[in-house]
């Protein structure tokens, strides 16, 4: 088993593709990818480092598999776990709810002890509001818009994975 668990929910395949891009950059020996629809509480508890991918649907709603998993997520003790979040949204058609699900999942795991890393700048995005903000200038995790800015996805993922790897000291962990 790898040291990092990447868990995603996806209806269209976009968030799944992002999860696989992240795994490819980190390496299969470092990160395992799991569909949250097929995952259990014990699956998440087996990792000290978690990357959680959650898309936002319509008017700020979480993807259905994550929505179904939230009660289980509320049972997990996240103390000692390092968590980075990533998610997809549409900043044009749903500008008032862009990547809201990042905030929804943050609001579940942070009070349960999760240490969240991987805040991402809001510069370059055009939206009106988001519950996924860490502060005025940062999302709580990587925000991806495959509908309006697909040409920026690969670069954003690459930069974010490097940032998260540094914040998590993955090189130190792997070389210990």
Swiss-Prot record:
InterPro entries: Flavodoxin, Flavodoxin/NO_synth, Flavodoxin_CS, Flavodoxin_lc, Flavoprotein-like_sf. It comes from Salmonella typhimurium (strain LT2 / SGSC1412 / ATCC 700720). PROSITE patterns: FLAVODOXIN, FLAVODOXIN_LIKE. Residues 4-165 form the Flavodoxin-like domain. The keyword Transport applies. Belongs to the flavodoxin family. Low-potential electron donor to a number of redox enzymes (Potential). Involved in the reactivation of inactive cob(II)alamin in methionine synthase. It comes from the Bacteria. This is Flavodoxin 1. Keywords: Electron transport, Flavoprotein, FMN, Transport. One of its GO terms (molecular function) is electron transfer activity.
């Amino acid at each position: 088993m790898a040291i990092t668990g990447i868990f995603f929910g996806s209806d269209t395949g976009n968030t799944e593709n992002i999860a696989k891009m992240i795994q490819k950059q980190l390496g299969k020996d470092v990160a395992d990818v799991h569909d949250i629809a097929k995952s259990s509480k014990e699956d998440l508890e087996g990792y000290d480092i978690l990357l959680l991918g959650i898309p936002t649907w319509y008017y700020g709603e979480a993807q259905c598999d994550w929505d179904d998993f939230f009660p289980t997520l509320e049972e997990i003790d996240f103390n000692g776990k390092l968590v980075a979040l990533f998610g997809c949204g549409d900043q044009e058609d749903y500008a008032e709810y862009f990547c809201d699900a990042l905030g929804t999942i943050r609001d579940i795991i942070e009070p349960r002890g999760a240490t969240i890393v991987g805040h991402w700048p809001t510069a370059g995005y055009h939206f009106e509001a988001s519950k996924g903000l860490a502060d005025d200038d940062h999302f709580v995790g990587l925000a991806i818009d495959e509908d309006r800015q697909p040409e920026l996805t690969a670069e954003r993922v690459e930069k974010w994975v490097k940032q998260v790897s540094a914040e998590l000291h993955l090189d130190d962990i792997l070389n210990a």
